[in-house]
Amino acid sequence: GCLGEGEKCADWSGPSCCDGFYCSCRSMPYCRCRNNS
């Protein structure tokens, strides 16, 4: 499965964000999937 909006993600390991989302690490200490539109 993939990660959706607001779910915790990691650039270096899976699972990755779903299509249409990217892993944003701006809101430390966690990275979260955000909509890339």
UniProtKB/Swiss-Prot annotation:
Pfam families cross-referenced by the UniProt entry: Toxin_7
Modified sites of kind Serine amide: 37
Keyword Magnesium among record annotations: no
Known uses: Could be considered as a biological insecticide candidate, when fused to Galanthus nivalis agglutinin (GNA), a protein with the potential to cross the insect gut. This chimeric Pl1a/GNA variant shows a gain in toxicity against insects when administered orally, while maintaining similar effects as the wild-type toxin when injected. Transport of Pl1a/GNA variant from gut contents to the hemolymph of cabbage moth larvae, and binding to the nerve cord, has been shown.
Known tissue expression: Expressed by the venom gland.
GO cellular component: extracellular region
Site residues by UniProt (Pharmacophore): 8, 12, 22, 24, 26, 28, 30, 32, 34
Keywords carried by this UniProt record: Amidation, Disulfide bond, Ion channel impairing toxin, Knottin, Neurotoxin, Secreted, Toxin, Voltage-gated sodium channel impairing toxin
Subcellular compartments: Secreted
Domain of life: Eukaryota
Similarity field: Belongs to the neurotoxin 07 (Beta/delta-agtx) family. 02 (aga-3) subfamily.
Gene Ontology MF term list: sodium channel inhibitor activity; toxin activity
Domains as described in the record: The presence of a 'disulfide through disulfide knot' structurally defines this protein as a knottin.
Protein's name in the database: Delta-amaurobitoxin-Pl1a
InterPro entries attached to this UniProt entry: Beta/delta-agatoxin_fam (IPR016328)
